[in-house]
Swiss-Prot record:
GO cellular component: HslUV protease complex; proteasome core complex
Active site residues per record: 2
One Gene Ontology term from the biological process aspect of the record: proteolysis involved in protein catabolic process
Origin: domain of life: Bacteria
Family: Belongs to the peptidase T1B family. HslV subfamily.
Keywords from the UniProt entry: Allosteric enzyme, Cytoplasm, Hydrolase, Metal-binding, Protease, Sodium, Threonine protease
Cellular localization per UniProt: Cytoplasm
Binding sites annotated in the UniProt record for Na(+): 157, 160, 163
Alphabetical list of NCBIfam families matching this protein: ATP_dep_HslV (TIGR03692), PRK05456.1 (NF003964)
PROSITE patterns (alphabetical): PROTEASOME_BETA_2
Record-linked InterPro entries: ATP-dep_Prtase_HsIV_su, Ntn_hydrolases_N, Proteasome_sua/b, Proteasome_suB-type
Described function: Protease subunit of a proteasome-like degradation complex believed to be a general protein degrading machinery.
Name recorded for this polypeptide: ATP-dependent protease subunit HslV
Length: 182
């Protein structure tokens, strides 16, 4: 597996992921790129799960973004519908974390599209560790989104054997003023 974390703070959103690819208990690759920019660099996406499955889903998601002129939520819902109902897609095992300048979403193979509380996403084998770390950093520090994502991935990498310290980090700055969380 892997760890993907997405943090939104002060008009910036970051999706970061480690680079480890495992086959059973063996590390096959340490520098995989599991975070990408899509749709003219306006959407960030990261995956946890099977690599080949995730690349298939990236392609499908990007085509949905094109179809819906970059509208993240519509594209995510359409992908989730296809993923749940298409016999071939249904067998794909991966989770997607996606974000644009206004929304952060988790897309699952069960047909779920979830906008998490506080726009914090952490998925994959080290996701619980990264989420706990990122939550603590969001609530108790003034670190920016990138620093929180990096630190939470490092903590997950120290604990989870399926997460390493080779990170890919992508960041978007929002021009849209978002309401402050209460």
């Amino acid at each position: 597996m892997t760890t993907i974390v997405s943090v939104r703070r002060n008009n910036k959103v970051v999706i970061a992921g480690d680079g480890q690819v495992s086959l059973g208990n063996t590390v096959m690759k340490g520098n995989a790129r599991k975070v990408r920019r899509l749709y003219n660099n306006k959407v960030l996406a990261g995956f946890a799960g099977g690599t080949a499955d995730a690349f298939t889903l990236f392609e499908k998601f990007e085509s949905k973004l094109q179809m819906h002129q970059g509208h993240l939520t519509k594209a995510a819902v359409e992908l989730a519908k296809d993923w749940r109902s298409d016999r071939a897609l249904r067998k794909l095992e991966a989770l997607l974390a996606v974000a644009d300048e206004t929304a952060s979403l988790i897309i699952t193979g069960n047909g779920d599209v979830v906008q998490p509380e506080n726009d914090l996403i952490a998925i994959g084998s080290g996701g619980n560790f990264a989420q706990a770390a990122a939550t603590a950093l969001l609530e108790n520090t003034d670190l920016d989104a990138r620093e929180i994502a990096e630190k939470s991935l490092n903590i997950a990498g120290d604990i989870c054997v399926f997460t390493n310290h080779h990170h890919t980090i992508e960041e978007l700055e929002s021009t849209v003023e978002l309401p402050k969380p209460e």
